[in-house]
């Protein structure tokens, strides 16, 4: 028997980027769910300092194809963007057996007060979890993929460049994966302190003689694995310089249209280093026979309640102040870790 729709059309609001550094609200009509769909009211959503700020600033090539299931087309303006939303299901369509009204879910969806999506898109969050922790599903999934790409071995040393949200998560997971030592490099003192609180062995400030300091801290070997997740092309050079012979540099940043100049004639060539791109849209090929996105998500949901991720939320804005939140992230990135938008319980 098909479920009865509790509501008809619902009026909502979505945040759009109309032009570089211009965020504005636009009305949305949220239709009742059709067969195989669910309708969700947003509780909180998270602003990504990496990819999302590239989009906000207009630093993504406009002909790049959007790769999120809730988005279609390309990255040109105007664009509705965002991919970390937690809300509650309030209506389900015919044939939906896995969701009921009241279920707490994570959805890769732009910043919007309510939305209707196919039932295969929402992710059930663990019972009793704080919605704030649920916001980290996307970043944690990215971090798991990066650690898989790093292929860290028991007792090896890893250095993570950048201690934003993804960098903090990568460093924590590298320890859980068996790294003997994990060092981090981060210019912001508050983030270095948070990095230490999350269990890394040493948090370094970038600058003069960084590679030399890393070699000294690793008994002259250098790092077995370096991970560049700061978004800074300069940090990629530092990662290459700090990597041990036959070591791996994992490039997990998306630089957008920022030019990247890398000297491949010195340390990279003589040390026989490997450069590896990491992007969450694909499972590492050597794992594909055994891993898929469903298994990766199971791992994320198992880790989610155990990492105390609420501590990473540094700023909380009402949804109606979203344009101000984006200006803050754009102009003062060093003052924050994770900025969230609060819609009130159930929108």
Language model features by range: what are they?
Residues 220, 262-313, 324:
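C-terminal substrate-binding/catalytic core of Rossmann-like NAD(P)-dependent dehydrogenases/reductases
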Residues 108-119:
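A structural motif shared across PLP-dependent enzymes of the aminotransferase-like
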Residues 130-208, 212:
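Mid-domain Rossmann-like dinucleotide-binding core that forms the NAD(H)/NADP(H) cofactor-binding site
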Residues 198-276:
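Glycine-rich cofactor phosphate-binding loops and adjacent beta1-alpha1 units
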Residues 28-85:
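N-terminal glycine-rich beta->alpha transition that marks the start or flank
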Residues 81-108:
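A glycine-/small-residue-rich N-terminal strand-loop-strand element
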């Amino acid at each position: 028997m098909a479920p009865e729709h509790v509501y008809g059309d619902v009026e909502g609001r979505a945040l759009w980027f109309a032009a570089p550094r211009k965020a504005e609200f636009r009305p949305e009509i949220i239709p009742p769910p059709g067969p195989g769909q669910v309708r969700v009211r947003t509780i909180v959503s998270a602003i990504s300092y990496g990819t999302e700020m590239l989009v906000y600033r207009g630093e993504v090539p406009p002909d790049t194809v959007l790769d999120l299931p809730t988005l279609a087309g390309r990255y040109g303006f105007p664009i509705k963007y965002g991919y970390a939303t937690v809300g509650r299901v309030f209506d389900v369509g015919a044939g939906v057996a896995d969701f009921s009204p009241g279920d707490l879910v994570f959805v890769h969806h732009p910043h919007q007060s309510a939305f209707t999506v196919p039932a295969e898109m929402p992710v059930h969050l663990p019972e009793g979890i704080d919605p704030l922790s649920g916001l980290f599903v996307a970043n944690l999934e990215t971090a798991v993929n990066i650690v898989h790409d790093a292929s860290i071995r028991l007792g090896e040393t890893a250095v993570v460049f950048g201690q934003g949200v993804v960098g903090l998560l990568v460093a924590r997971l590298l320890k859980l994966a068996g790294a003997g030592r994990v060092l981090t490099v981060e210019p912001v003192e508050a983030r270095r302190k948070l990095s230490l609180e999350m269990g890394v062995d040493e948090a370094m400030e970038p600058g003069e003689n960084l590679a030399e300091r890393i070699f000294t801290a690793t008994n002259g070997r250098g790092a077995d694995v370096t991970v560049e997740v700061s978004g800074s092309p300069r940090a990629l050079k530092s990662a290459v310089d700090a990597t041990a012979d036959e070591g791996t540099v994992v490039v997990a940043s998306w630089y957008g249209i920022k030019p990247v100049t890398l000297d491949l004639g010195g340390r990279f060539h003589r040390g026989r280093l490997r450069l590896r791109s990491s992007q969450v849209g694909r499972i590492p090929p050597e794992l594909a026979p055994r891993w898929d996105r469903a298994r990766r998500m199971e791992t994320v949901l198992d880790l989610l309640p155990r990492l105390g991720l609420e501590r990473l939320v540094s700023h909380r804005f009402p949804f109606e102040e979203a344009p101000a939140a984006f200006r803050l992230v754009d102009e003062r990135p060093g003052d924050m870790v994770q900025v969230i938008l609060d819609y009130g319980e159930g929108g």
